[in-house]
Curated annotation (Swiss-Prot):
Motif (EAR-like (transcriptional repression)): 3-7
Protein name: Auxin-responsive protein IAA9
Name of a matching Pfam family: AUX_IAA
Region of interest (Disordered), residue spans: 1-41
Gene Ontology terms: biological process: auxin-activated signaling pathway; regulation of DNA-templated transcription; response to auxin
Biological role: Aux/IAA proteins are short-lived transcriptional factors that function as repressors of early auxin response genes at low auxin concentrations.
Localization of this protein: Nucleus
Species, as recorded: Oryza sativa subsp. japonica
InterPro entries hit by this protein: AUX/IAA_dom (IPR033389), AUX_IAA (IPR003311), PB1-like (IPR053793)
A GO-annotated cellular component: nucleus
Keywords: Auxin signaling pathway, Nucleus, Repressor, Transcription, Transcription regulation
Tissue: Expressed in etiolated shoots and flowers.
Gene field: IAA9
Every PB1 domain range: 92-182
């Protein structure tokens, strides 16, 4: 019994492709079922559809010593995909910075900074203040009670601390994100 896939009831008199080719080569007229014009013109599955490419490659086609194969199969780390070579060269230590009241946060590369003063200058360029706030700050500087923005950071333990309380190296190693208040 052969498996027939189709919408017609089983064994409805349709010939299988193998039977059709054997009956036409043997003389054609003495087949067990009549051949209609519509079934003779139908294509087989392999003729109707092309073979698809495999989406998964287990690497069995390449030798492990092949350098071209190694270059093609660079490993991907994280999301979005970043090649391991790019991640290994690294050196970048990006930290998210959010200012209270601003809808958009930014990122700062701490590897480009070597002190708190450089970081403060970068943050001042990234988050400029209005002219009125600058005038108030200058007026307060004369009296000695400058009320500038307070910068806090979240360390590796999840605690929020003031920027400048610890040495720069410890800060750069432990900071996860920055928040500017005021």
């Amino acid at each position: 019994m052969e498996l027939e896939l189709g919408l017609a009831p089983p064994n409805s008199g349709h010939l299988v492709v193998d039977e059709l080719s054997s009956s036409s080569s043997s003389g054609g007229g003495s087949g067990s079922a009549p051949v209609s014009a519509s079934s003779a013109g139908k294509r087989g599955f392999r003729e109707a559809f092309q073979e698809t490419l495999l989406l998964f490659d287990d690497g069995s086609c390449c030798n492990t010593s092949d350098d071209d194969c190694r270059r093609r199969k660079k490993t991907v780390v994280g999301w979005p995909p970043v090649s391991s070579a790019r991640r290994a060269c690294g050196g970048a230590n990006y930290v998210k910075v959010k200012k209270e009241g601003d809808a958009i946060g930014r990122k700062v590369d701490l590897a480009l900074h070597s002190s708190y003063d450089e970081l403060a200058a970068t943050l001042a360029r990234m988050f400029p203040t209005n002219d009125h706030q600058g005038e108030k700050k200058m007026a307060n500087d004369d009296h000695g009670d400058a009320a500038g923005p307070v910068v806090t950071y979240e360390d590796g333990d999840g605690d929020w601390m003031l920027v400048g309380d610890v040495p720069w190296d410890d800060f750069a190693r432990s900071v996860k994100r920055l928040k500017i208040l005021g």
